[in-house]
A protein has these predicted regions:
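Bacterial N-terminal signal peptides that target proteins for export
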Residues: 1-9
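Bacterial N-terminal signal peptides
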Residues: 9-18
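Bacterial Sec-dependent N-terminal signal peptides
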Residues: 18-39, 237
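Generic alpha-helical propensity signal that fires on short helical segments
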Residues: 19, 69, 174-175
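C-terminal, surface-exposed recognition/capping segments
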Residues: 31, 39, 46, 53-60, ...
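A short glycine-rich, aromatic-capped structural motif
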Residues: 38-131, 156, 160-165
Length: 293
């Protein structure tokens, strides 16, 4: 097939996708900040946020933070590798409050490996959240090279905000989230507040437990790129064995976990648990947000 025919075929394929999905005329751009997905998500009755374009990543040897270039990107973790300040690969799972800023915790470096949960008290305070005091315990305080590269632009969602996104948001379509397999990666799709359900057909919407996660909402890379670039869908990728995303809130419940834990959003294929506990020393993903004006 010559170049002209290839180009014609590509254009026809794009037209088929647009018609097949019931695609509407391109909606006005929201002018999302650098490094953000162009969709708005309510975190309470009066406030919206943009999600970052991917999970947070860090390279110890260069002290560099960045967002994953694709929403479905996860770094295959090897628990037997010793990570220190000289490690020259990227990591994307962190103990709680390990922003790299010396905010008062014993362990504040992103590569910290202590299994003593008290070493990760934000600001050295057992009852402090990441956003308390100077805010420097939050990973979003850092310069992120593909996210505006300024301090204090991003932040981690609180426990209550995670719960609002999954359970309480009022959206145009009524859809808030769905399990999916995107480009062979398992994940949770979050629909923006103004999602139009005629654009693409999703099943098992707003269900935290499903029975066929491996064949539910299977989306190719091509279709996903068209959806998330224009319509602002967010994907929270997960490992097949499960993973968790940190909140900025410490565990303020008087339960058996006590102050050793912070709150998280955890998931495995087919299951979602919001507002659960995770020991502070455990390594979890971080997905940052930026407040909308």
């Amino acid at each position: 097939m010559n170049r002209t025919l290839k180009a014609t075929a590509a254009i026809m394929l794009m037209m088929v996708f647009a018609v097949g999905c019931g695609k509407q005329p391109m909606k006005p751009q929201k002018q999302a900040p650098e490094g953000a997905v162009d969709g708005l998500f309510s975190i309470n009755e009066n406030k919206q946020v943009y999600f970052s374009q991917g999970n947070l990543q860090y390279q110890p040897s260069s002290n560099t933070w960045q967002f994953a270039w694709n929403q479905y990107d996860c770094i295959d973790r090897n628990d037997y590798i010793v990570i220190d300040e000289n490690y020259d690969e990227w990591i994307d799972a962190f103990a709680w409050g390990t922003s790299g800023n010396n905010h008062g915790a014993v362990c504040y470096q992103p590569w910290s490996n202590s299994e003593n949960d008290a070493d990760y008290f934000a600001y050295g305070d057992s009852v402090a959240n990441l956003y308390d005091h100077t805010g420097q315990a939050d990973w979003g305080y850092n310069r992120i090279r593909n996210g505006g590269n300024q301090t204090g632009q991003w932040r981690t969602l609180t426990k209550d905000e995670w719960e609002y996104i999954f359970d309480k948001r009022t959206t145009t379509s009524g859809a808030r989230f769905a399990h999916a397999v995107v480009n062979n990666a398992f994940g949770i799709i979050l629909f923006p507040d103004d999602w139009d359900p005629t654009v693409y057909s999703f099943v098992e919407v707003n269900k935290k437990k499903i029975f066929s996660p491996f064949i539910t909402n299977v989306i190719s890379e091509t279709d996903w790129n068209a959806l998330h670039y224009q319509y602002g869908l967010v994907l929270l990728p997960i490992y097949q064995r499960g993973c968790a995303y940190w909140s900025s809130s410490y565990n303020d419940k008087n339960d058996e976990y006590g102050l050793n834990c912070a709150f998280e959003m955890s998931t495995l294929p087919g299951f979602i648990f919001v507002g659960t506990n995770e020991y502070r020393h455990n390594k979890c993903y971080v997905r940052l947000v930026q407040d909308a004006d």
